[in-house]
Amino acid sequence: MATLLRVSSLCRANRASAFKSLLIRPVPCLTQDHHMVQTSQIHTSPNHHAGSKAASMHWTSERALSVALLGLLPAAYLYPGAAMDYSLAAALTLHGHWGLGQVVTDYVHGDAKIKMANTSLFALSALTFAGLCYFNYHDVGICKAVSMLWSL
C-alpha cells in the first residue's frame, strides 16, 4: 500500500524522497490562498429587444395565421365566393411573406444585402397580393380556379 500516503507527509520537507518511487504520483500541497480568487468574465451580446413583446406577438400571429389557413382552405372549397377569394389572397400572401422573411433572416448576411433582400421581399409580396386581387376581380377567382384545375 505504498500508494496510500497522507497528503501532509507530501507537503513536508522530505517531499523529494517520496516522489522517487514509481508507484507514487506527485500530489500538490493543499495550501489555501484566500487572497487569490479566480473569477471568470462572461461576455454576452447586448439584448436589444429584452422589454419588447413585438417578437412574441409576431410569432403568435404567424401561428394563428397558419392555424387559420388550416380551416380557411377547406372552407374555400366548400363555400367559394368573392370574400373567400380575397381572404385567401391576403392570408396566403402574408403567410408567404413571413416564411420568406425567415429565409432572408437566416441566410442573407451583410447590411446592404439584407436591405436589398427585404426591399425585394416587400416588392414581391405586394406584387403577389396585387396579382391575386387582379385575378379575383377580373377572372374567376382563386376558389373557382382551383376547382377548375381539380376537375381536369
From Swiss-Prot:
This is Succinate dehydrogenase [ubiquinone] cytochrome b small subunit, mitochondrial. One of its GO terms (cellular component) is respiratory chain complex II (succinate dehydrogenase). Residues 22-56, 105-113 are mitochondrial matrix. It comes from Xenopus tropicalis. Membrane-anchoring subunit of succinate dehydrogenase (SDH) that is involved in complex II of the mitochondrial electron transport chain and is responsible for transferring electrons from succinate to ubiquinone (coenzyme Q). SDH also oxidizes malate to the non-canonical enol form of oxaloacetate, enol-oxaloacetate. Enol-oxaloacetate, which is a potent inhibitor of the succinate dehydrogenase activity, is further isomerized into keto-oxaloacetate. Component of complex II composed of four subunits: the flavoprotein (FP) SDHA, iron-sulfur protein (IP) SDHB, and a cytochrome b560 composed of SDHC and SDHD. The chain crosses the membrane at residues 57-78, 84-104, 114-135. PANTHER family: SUCCINATE DEHYDROGENASE (PTHR13337), SUCCINATE DEHYDROGENASE [UBIQUINONE] CYTOCHROME B SMALL SUBUNIT, MITOCHONDRIAL (PTHR13337:SF2). Belongs to the CybS family. The keyword Transport applies. Residues 79-83, 136-152 are mitochondrial intermembrane.
